[in-house]
């Protein structure tokens, strides 16, 4: 099992924690005391949406992210497993929704 450094950024504030490759980024954040938004925990609702600025994740169960947004770096932290050190912008639910479905009504 590999361990990686994860930096999460929200509103200009940065927090860093370690994440094991066999644990989701969200679970690792919670274990480190980093509070991130989440709801369904199954990769569907997009509450935990984030955008990867650098690094790679494996997210085979991210049903809430289409192929094109995934290519642009969007991920769902509840089902994203780190495969390298990561730098991530969090709280991207509205942005991801707009990208996939247009502006929320």
From Swiss-Prot:
Q: Which residues bind [2Fe-2S] cluster?
A: 40, 45, 48, 78
The 2Fe-2S ferredoxin-type domain, residue ranges: 4-94
Which UniProt keyword terms apply here?
A: 2Fe-2S, Electron transport, Iron, Iron-sulfur, Metal-binding, Transport
Q: Which PROSITE patterns match?
A: 2FE2S_FER_1, 2FE2S_FER_2
**Known InterPro entries for this protein?**
2Fe-2S_ferredoxin-like_sf, 2Fe-2S_ferredoxin-type, 2Fe2S_fd_BS, Beta-grasp_dom_sf, Fd_pln
Alphabetized GO MF terms = 2 iron, 2 sulfur cluster binding; electron transfer activity; metal ion binding
Q: From its record, what is one biological process in GO terms?
A: electron transport chain
Source taxon at top rank: Bacteria
Transport as a keyword of this entry, yes or no, is yes
| Cofactors demanded by this protein | [2Fe-2S] cluster
The note on cofactor binding and number reads: Binds 1 [2Fe-2S] cluster.
Q: What does this protein do?
A: Ferredoxins are iron-sulfur proteins that transfer electrons in a wide variety of metabolic reactions.
How is the subunit organization of this protein annotated in UniProt? Answer: Forms a complex with heterodimeric ferredoxin-thioredoxin reductase (FTR) and thioredoxin.
Q: Which family does it belong to?
A: Belongs to the 2Fe2S plant-type ferredoxin family.
The name this protein goes by in its record: Ferredoxin-2
Q: Which organism is it from?
A: Synechococcus sp. (strain ATCC 27144 / PCC 6301 / SAUG 1402/1)
């Amino acid at each position: 099992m590999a361990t990686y450094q994860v930096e999460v950024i929200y509103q200009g504030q940065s927090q860093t924690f370690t994440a094991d490759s066999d644990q989701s980024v969200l679970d690792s954040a919670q274990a480190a005391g980093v509070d991130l938004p989440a709801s369904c925990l199954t990769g569907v609702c997009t509450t935990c949406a984030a955008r990867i600025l650098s690094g790679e994740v494996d997210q085979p169960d991210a049903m809430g992210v289409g192929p094109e947004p995934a290519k642009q770096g969007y991920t769902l932290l509840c089902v994203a497993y780190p495969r390298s050190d990561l730098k991530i912008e969090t709280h991207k639910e509205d942005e991801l929704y707009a990208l996939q479905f247009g502006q929320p009504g």
